[in-house]
Amino acid sequence: MEIRKRKGKQVGRLTVTDKQHQEDLQRLRLLRPIDDDFMRCLFKDNIPLAEFVLRIITDKPDLIITECETQKDMKRLAGARSICLDAYGTDSVGKKYDLEVQRQDKGADPHRARYHSSVMDIENLHSGQEFKELPDTYTIFIIEKDFYGQGEAVYPIERINLATGKSFEDGEHILYVNGEYRGDSAMGKLMYDFNCTKADDMNFELMANRTRYLKENPKGVSEMCKIMEDMRSESLKEVALRMLSAGKYALEEIANISGLSLDEVKKLKAERSA
């Protein structure tokens, strides 16, 4: 914080950084598990919580999760569109789970679910392997609203043989979870928790404890603020890179519009040209 003297007294004046920090703290207070930025932090290095949530959603009480990554970058084919998974887990028998939260229906388009599922296939079949070695995959979209409007807690999407009416059994599973669902069941309580801003209002201890850490513990708050600062920085860089790609802006203009320093813009240009 900058301090200026005025008639013998010190008067505090917030810098831009201080103002942003205060805005971040306010934003943090309003974040819920159904917000993807917060959800990724909830699940980061937290296999017990991921396992607990997946057990409820998949209705597999004996599910054992052995690995869980957040913001898993998936791009195995050159030129293909990359995606970053909110939470990517593996269970004790090798099945894969992609857990996503979507605030808006457009983010849950069925084609997106199809692509997420296909990307997991590409990620998990290596050269020389047989197709039958593909692991079962679960693409799970938790959507803030009831995407299909039928009041169900979960909408399982499975391929079937239309001629026989039997399951295709290709190991691909897509689940749309209704974020509006409420009730006394574990799923109803879980969706309630996903929409809570306060840990004290939550039903489940694992969810509440992690939320309390990220929102109330100084170390957790610092972690969240650092993540929000990094995201803001990445957003500024994206603006600058688009302007550099346009090729019609002076570096000083890019710095002024993007909010980056001139040195940062020069560095981006050098990296882009390398």
Predicted regions and their residues:
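Accessory alpha/beta interaction modules
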Residues: 1-173, 183-185
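Short, charged alpha-helical interaction segments and adjacent helix-coil junctions
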Residues: 2-29, 97-102, 188-274
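Short hydrophobic beta-strand segments that form the core of ligand-binding sensory/regulatory domains
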Residues: 176
